[in-house]
């Protein structure tokens, strides 16, 4: 089982979102605990992270380090890759 850690930037990103989007993202975090590579998609050009998780129009960018899933960024799909 993996542990989820959020960077300061990810906490800030999450704080800017509406409550319903936060809830949907937190529900997806539970899926990351068991198999982050199974639910996440590997990025072809990992500039800001190695994997992404799709939550509607929002994306969660993360890396995996041993037993940790490190959430790097959270944002709308039109802005997250800039």
What does each model-found stretch correspond to?
Residues 1-12, 16-23, 55-58, 63-82:
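Enriched for short, Lys/Arg-rich terminal
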Residues 1-5, 27-31, 43:
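Charged, low-complexity, helix/coiled-coil-prone segments
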Residues 19, 23, 27-30, 34:
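Generic detection of well-ordered alpha-helical segments
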Residues 30-53:
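A short, surface-exposed loop/turn module that caps and links secondary-structure elements
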